[in-house]
């Protein structure tokens, strides 16, 4: 194990590490942010990169936090994922290459038709009231 991975193992919970570094999936309906609707942004738990806004979150009923779009498409990479005999599109963050979840073409049509199905363990929530203090002041405008 290299030094960076060792530091991540110390900083992250076992579930956060398994999800972001080993592409694990948390159990449906078990994640902290599945049924969570405060206003703010969701960032990569590894790098802090801004990923999703609560304004784009919706209840897809799938058991994981679901979003119609990222804050900035350039903050995500998409990869073909054919593991477990399925044909899916994996979503990772660009800064830390953290596994986040998958994107599916079955989201609300009136909001672009995509469903970003994301593991809570890959995310950290920053409330609107804390955006400036936490270094994310540039995202205040998303909530005005």
From Swiss-Prot:
EC numbers, comma separated: 1.8.4.12
Enzyme kind, highest EC tier: oxidoreductase
Residues forming the catalytic site: 117
Gene3D superfamilies listed in its UniProt record: Peptide methionine sulfoxide reductase
Renumbered residue ranges of the record's region Disordered: 1-25
GO molecular function, one term: peptide-methionine (R)-S-oxide reductase activity
Catalytic activity as recorded in UniProt: L-methionyl-[protein] + [thioredoxin]-disulfide + H2O = L-methionyl-(R)-S-oxide-[protein] + [thioredoxin]-dithiol
GO biological process assignments: protein repair; response to oxidative stress
Domain MsrB: 5-128
Keywords: Oxidoreductase
Biased composition (Basic and acidic residues): 1-12
Family membership noted in the UniProt record: Belongs to the MsrB Met sulfoxide reductase family.
Record protein name field: Peptide methionine sulfoxide reductase MsrB
């Amino acid at each position: 194990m290299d030094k960076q991975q060792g530091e991540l193992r110390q900083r992250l919970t076992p579930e956060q590490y398994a999800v972001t570094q080993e592409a694990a999936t948390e159990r449906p309906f078990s994640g902290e942010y599945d049924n969570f609707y405060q206003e703010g942004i969701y960032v990569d738990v590894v790098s802090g990169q801004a990923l999703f806004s609560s304004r784009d979150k919706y209840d897809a009923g799938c058991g994981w936090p679901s979003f119609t779009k990222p804050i900035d498409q350039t903050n995500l990479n998409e990869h073909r994922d054919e593991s477990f005999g399925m044909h899916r599109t994996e979503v990772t963050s660009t800064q830390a290459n953290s596994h986040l979840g998958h994107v599916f073409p079955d989201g609300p049509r009136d909001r672009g038709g995509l469903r970003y199905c994301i593991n809570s363990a890959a995310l950290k929530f920053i409330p609107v009231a804390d955006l400036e203090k936490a270094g994310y002041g540039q995202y205040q405008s998303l909530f005005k």
